[in-house]
Amino acid sequence: MDLTLIPEFKLRLWENIMNLNVKDAASCKYDMISLGEIMLRLDPGEGRIKTARSFRAWEGGGEYNVARGLRRCFGMRTAAVTALADNEVGRLVEDFMLEGGVDTSLIKWVPYDGIGRTVRNGLNFTERGFGIRGALGVSDRGNTAVSKLKPGDIDWEHIFGELGVRWFHTGGIFAALSETTAEVVIEAVKTAKKYGTIVSYDLNYRPSLWKDIGGKEKAQEVNKKIAKYVDVMIGNEEDFTACLGFEVEGNDANLKKLNIDGYCKMLSEVVKVYPNFKAI
């Protein structure tokens, strides 16, 4: 392993992190806002989804969980930008959000047609693992209100320019929901940067979300456009490979022997291609 690569890489990232000019709290209504889908999570406890007769309900979403965690753990002023069908399920999700202390004023409420033909709310069944049995997640999120968001639906000028936001977080799950959600991300990050808001993005590659809309090729097309506006990029080596096209050299096919130098070199290449990344 070439140890000379690690100090150089760490130094470059540390210098960039120190240059994260987060806006003054007094000038902003929110410390952080998220953009993404928030689903009703149904948990069968110790049981199996396919045999359960009762579920415990929660709310959750890859991007939203960051806002909730910052509010509950650190008392930060957070809000979630999302869309929900205006029915009892949507209002239940809102109630969970309120319980978590997250501001719900930025939710876009979409009229419900009574059966979900035009719009609905997402469900996520989550089964915990036990022993050698792996955990299982089953998402029912097609045709959801948030997947229908398109550029112009959210007043980003008002959010970033008038209300003020110190940190904006979104990710690859939301970007993969539809052609238009990717466009909404780009619209949002451009406006965030215009007003000096720090942008973080979780690549969070999910093959199931991309496979029917172009797979890795589409994921890279979308994420490369977004990456140009990101300050803090989050992901593992699989995310950087699938979403941004970088490769780790020297690993065997089964990943039984890992080439640490290869990971360092890949990350060094990442910061060369995207000098705007201040932290990875």
Protein language model features and the residues they cover:
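Glycine/threonine-rich flexible loop motifs
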Residues: A175-E183, K211, L244-G245
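Positively charged, low-complexity intrinsically disordered leader regions
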Residues: M18-I49
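Alpha-helix C-terminal capping segments
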Residues: W58, N65-R77, E99
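Hydrophobic beta-strand scaffold residues
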Residues: T78, T104, V199-Y201, I234
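Short pre-catalytic strand/loop immediately N-terminal to key active-site residues, enriched for Gly-Thr
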Residues: T51-G60
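Conserved N-terminal subdomain of the carbohydrate kinase-like
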Residues: R77-G172
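Short, Lys/Arg-enriched N-terminal segments with co-localized hydrophobic residues
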Residues: L3-I17
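Conserved phosphate/ATP/ADP-binding segment of small-molecule kinases
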Residues: R206-I280
